[in-house]
């Protein structure tokens, strides 16, 4: 097959920008620590973010089920299971492919963060094949209040779907998360790994048997939308779940599934997207690993589409490609910009890592003389620029990781960080009272160390402030892939 050629502006790739030196080890440790600030439920004695305390201890009570635990997705107090599952998948992928670059302490903490998510996801599928749990908390009342998690008195309604109502996207992502986590824990805790895999298998069976989107069900749509509607459909999560189960089990039946459903499920559509809603980019990169390692010809089209994604990082390529801000930030429209930057950069580095370890010909990315190819170093340079932009090498000279460096936003859109801790202010802060903290001109009393926030706009401008949620709200699904990127650059600085 003739190699796919992607032309681009060479100077962007072969000349490194003048940057300050960053402490990737410190950033990595902090990016994992962030997850302790998002914990829900009973907090352990070894909790390092001591301004956080137990919260939401009756979750699931309205359905007579234990749904205590898990993560709050962002700056509010809702547990949305769809993005939580994606977060868990990416924490697992970071551990699987980049755990060898982490220190023993960082790898341990990453696995602790992963287990916190996977333990909770096991609860969400504990009643399959009859019922799957979708979410805990009512967004409208929650968003009408500004309450720290420890005090919240808004309804903690748990939502569930009964079979045969469809939930392919939610169940497919949970299956992917549990399968990926089973791989991450296989060496450290084989019994737990098997438990995760067994549940991944039956969750995927539910996803495939009851096809359709979980947000198409009236009883959950009003609770989930517009926050985490499955806009991209459910088919990508079925491919995503199958790809992770193939990697976890090695079974050829998942190869067959991927081959039979590739076109009808849209693996070559919107291939330059990756995040909590759209898994197409991730599917193609993950399946490409099979082609590199085992030369499975039947799934080679996934690798071909992954190549198109890689080419889209370079501006003068034919067809769709990424957009960049004047300061070099990979930019896609959305409510939280850096989630796109981090997730897509993760795929670039991961694909190049797979390619560099294979015997296959590198991807040709320039057709002039001399020829240039997508090598590990080229990917490193591109990924390095995006990581360093987040850490402070940007026109604002601002670190978008809270607690990293000397200049980072002191006010973020986060209830727990902006409210006084119950350690210093044990009196409950009620719904309307909390808005005093929201509108305070003072810095947040609690530093949510390691949180990567939404970030700047397409012109590299950053206004900040608690009212500007798109710029200052952190999310778990930004940090999860960032863990892998930081681990790699800690061991392989450009």
UniProtKB/Swiss-Prot annotation:
<dbReference type="InterPro" id="IPR001701">
    <property type="entry name" value="Glyco_hydro_9"/>
</dbReference>
<keyword id="KW-0119">Carbohydrate metabolism</keyword>
<feature type="signal peptide">
    <location>
        <begin position="1"/>
        <end position="21"/>
    </location>
</feature>
<dbReference type="InterPro" id="IPR018221">
    <property type="entry name" value="Glyco_hydro_9_His_AS"/>
</dbReference>
<feature type="active site">
    <location>
        <position position="413"/>
    </location>
</feature>
<keyword id="KW-0732">Signal</keyword>
<keyword id="KW-0624">Polysaccharide degradation</keyword>
<dbReference type="GO" id="GO:0008810">
    <property type="term" value="F:cellulase activity"/>
</dbReference>
<dbReference type="GO" id="GO:0071555">
    <property type="term" value="P:cell wall organization"/>
</dbReference>
<dbReference type="GO" id="GO:0030245">
    <property type="term" value="P:cellulose catabolic process"/>
</dbReference>
<feature type="active site">
    <location>
        <position position="473"/>
    </location>
</feature>
<keyword id="KW-0136">Cellulose degradation</keyword>
<keyword id="KW-0961">Cell wall biogenesis/degradation</keyword>
<keyword id="KW-0326">Glycosidase</keyword>
<feature type="glycosylation site" description="N-linked (GlcNAc...) asparagine">
    <location>
        <position position="468"/>
    </location>
</feature>
<dbReference type="GO" id="GO:0005576">
    <property type="term" value="C:extracellular region"/>
</dbReference>
<keyword id="KW-0964">Secreted</keyword>
<protein>
    <recommendedName>
        <fullName>Endoglucanase 22</fullName>
        <ecNumber>3.2.1.4</ecNumber>
    </recommendedName>
</protein>
<feature type="active site" description="Nucleophile">
    <location>
        <position position="76"/>
    </location>
</feature>
<keyword id="KW-0325">Glycoprotein</keyword>
<keyword id="KW-0378">Hydrolase</keyword>
<dbReference type="InterPro" id="IPR008928">
    <property type="entry name" value="6-hairpin_glycosidase_sf"/>
</dbReference>
<dbReference type="Pfam" id="PF00759">
    <property type="entry name" value="Glyco_hydro_9"/>
</dbReference>
<comment type="similarity">
    <text>Belongs to the glycosyl hydrolase 9 (cellulase E) family.</text>
</comment>
<dbReference type="InterPro" id="IPR012341">
    <property type="entry name" value="6hp_glycosidase-like_sf"/>
</dbReference>
């Amino acid at each position: 097959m003739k190699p796919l050629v992607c032309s681009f502006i060479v100077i962007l790739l072969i000349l490194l920008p003048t940057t300050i030196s960053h402490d990737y080890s410190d950033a990595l440790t902090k990016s994992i620590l962030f997850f302790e600030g998002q914990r829900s439920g009973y907090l352990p004695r070894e909790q390092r973010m001591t301004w956080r305390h137990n919260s939401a201890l009756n979750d699931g009570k309205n359905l007579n089920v234990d749904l205590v635990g898990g993560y709050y997705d962002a700056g509010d107090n809702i547990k949305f299971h769809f993005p939580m599952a994606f977060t868990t998948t990416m924490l697992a992928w970071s551990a699987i492919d980049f755990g060898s670059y982490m220190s023993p302490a960082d790898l341990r903490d990453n696995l602790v963060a992963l287990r916190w998510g996977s333990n909770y996801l096991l609860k969400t599928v504990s009643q399959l094949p009859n019922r799957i749990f979708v979410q805990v908390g009512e967004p409208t009342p929650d968003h009408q209040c500004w309450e720290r998690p420890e005090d919240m008195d808004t309804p903690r309604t748990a939502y569930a779907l009964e079979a045969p109502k469809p939930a392919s996207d939610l169940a497919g992502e949970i299956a992917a998360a549990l399968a990926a986590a089973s791989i991450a824990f296989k060496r450290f805790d084989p019994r737990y790994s098997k438990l995760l895999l067994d549940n991944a298998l039956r969750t995927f069976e539910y996803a495939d048997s009851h096809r359709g989107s979980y947000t198409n069900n009236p009883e959950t749509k009003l609770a989930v939308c517009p926050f985490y509607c499955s806009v991209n459909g459910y088919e990508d999560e079925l491919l995503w779940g199958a790809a992770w189960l193939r990697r976890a089990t090695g079974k050829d039946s998942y190869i067959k599934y991927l081959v039979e459903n590739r076109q009808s499920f849209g693996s070559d559509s919107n291939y330059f997207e990756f995040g909590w809603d759209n898994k197409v980019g991730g599917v193609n990169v993950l399946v490409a690993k099979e082609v590199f390692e085992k030369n499975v010809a039947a799934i080679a089209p996934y690798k071909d589409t992954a190549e198109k994604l890689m080419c889209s990082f370079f501006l003068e390529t034919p067809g769709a490609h990424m957009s960049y801000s004047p300061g070099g930030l990979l930019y896609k429209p959305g409510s939280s910009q850096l989630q796109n930057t981090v997730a897509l950069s993760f795929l670039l580095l991961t694909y190049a890592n797979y390619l560099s370890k294979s015997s296959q010909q590198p991807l040709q990315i320039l057709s002039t003389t001399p020829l240039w190819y997508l090598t590990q170093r080229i990917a490193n340079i591109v990924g390095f620029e995006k990581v360093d932009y987040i850490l402070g090498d940007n026109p604002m000279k601002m670190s978008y990781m809270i607690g990293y460096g000397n200049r980072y936003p002191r006010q973020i859109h986060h209830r727990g960080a902006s409210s006084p801790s119950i350690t210093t202010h044990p009196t409950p802060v009620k719904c309307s009272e909390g808005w005093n903290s929201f509108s305070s001109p003072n810095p947040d009393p609690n530093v949510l160390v390691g949180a990567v926030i939404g970030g700047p706009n397409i012109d590299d401008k950053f206004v900040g402030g608690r009212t500007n949620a798109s710029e200052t709200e952190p999310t778990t699904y930004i940090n999860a892939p960032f863990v892998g990127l930081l681990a790699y650059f800690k061991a392989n600085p450009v």
